[in-house]
């Protein structure tokens, strides 16, 4: 499932390409045809992300998209649709095709607000700053940290709870905990205020980089392939990481074999030596 930085990049891409334009909105697959007909020819005003949820705003309504595990939203030169395209947003030269989403629905402003209300703080959205959205995110951050401090659940599970930390997925939670030397099985209530602040700060930094770069890189300069004289990582997820999907391989820092298990329904990876905190 794409993590939050991917959804934010898609929101930026939609706004940059189509923002302020009248666009064609169709459903080649047919499953969104009625809703698409209501939006066709209207102006796409902007798109925004909250966690792993994408909201595309038109003058005629809003589309709420969640890609789920297999969904994709791809920008290509305008051509005949390929495959099962649920939703196509296009101008005269470029089409954005949505395939296989978990959710694609036309929603009212009240329904959009209700969807956002269920989500936690988004590391890629402004916290505070005086705007309604920023102040909402600030309240969500306060709530997330408070609930984490009171919870007996493992921190590795809490970071995956989208009602607490929206947009954080398995890769980022795994890598942040490694970078800070924190055992993923530690109960949230055992974390100090300083540790929670470090988790939040590192999450913001890594996800912000991911949004800009379009890939997940979590290793520090001294652990890059060039610095260590090792081959670059080859993986569908791309990017250089410390422990994610490296079970049984030597830790890049201490050489101990990386361990793996399941937490919050997803694989998690850690170094038993580096993550004793």
Which residue stretches match the model-derived regions?
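Intrinsic-disorder/low-complexity coil detector
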Residues: 1, 27, 76, 80, ...
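Gly/Gly-Pro- and Ser/Thr-rich, intrinsically disordered tail segments characteristic of DNA damage-repair
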Residues: 1-109
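Basic, nucleic-acid-binding surfaces and adjacent catalytic neighborhoods in DNA/RNA-processing proteins
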Residues: 22-35, 48, 144-277
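Phosphate/anion-contacting hairpin/loop surfaces
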Residues: 63-179, 187, 199
């Amino acid at each position: 499932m794409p993590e939050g930085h991917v959804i934010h990049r898609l929101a930026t891409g939609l706004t940059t390409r189509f923002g302020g334009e009248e666009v064609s909105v169709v459903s080649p697959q047919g499953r969104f045809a009625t809703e698409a007909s209501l939006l066709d020819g209207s102006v796409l005003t902007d798109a925004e992300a909250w966690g792993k949820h994408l909201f595309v705003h038109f003058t005629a309504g809003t589309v709420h998209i969640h890609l789920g595990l297999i969904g994709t939203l791809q920008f290509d030169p305008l051509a005949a649709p390929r495959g099962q395209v649920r939703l196509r947003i296009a101008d005269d030269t470029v089409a954005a095709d949505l395939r296989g989403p978990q959710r694609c629905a036309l929603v009212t402003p009240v329904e959009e607000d209700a969807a956002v209300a269920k989500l936690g703080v988004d590391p890629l959205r402004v916290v505070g700053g005086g705007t309604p959205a920023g102040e909402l995110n600030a309240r969500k951050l306060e709530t997330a940290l408070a609930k984490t401090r009171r919870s007996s659940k493992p921190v590795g599970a809490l970071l995956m709870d989208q009602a607490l930390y929206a947009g954080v997925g398995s890769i980022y939670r795994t890598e942040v905990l490694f970078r800070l030397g924190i055992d993923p099985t530690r109960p949230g209530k055992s974390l100090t205020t300083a540790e929670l602040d470090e988790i939040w700060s590192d999450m913001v930094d890594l996800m912000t980089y991911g949004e800009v770069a379009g890939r997940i890189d979590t290793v520090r300069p001294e652990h890059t392939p060039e610095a260590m004289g090792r081959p670059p990582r080859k993986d569908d997820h791309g990017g250089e990481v410390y422990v994610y999907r490296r079970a049984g391989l030597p830790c890049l820092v201490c050489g101990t074999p990386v361990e793996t298990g399941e937490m919050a329904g997803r694989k998690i990876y850690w170094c038993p030596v580096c993550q004793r905190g």
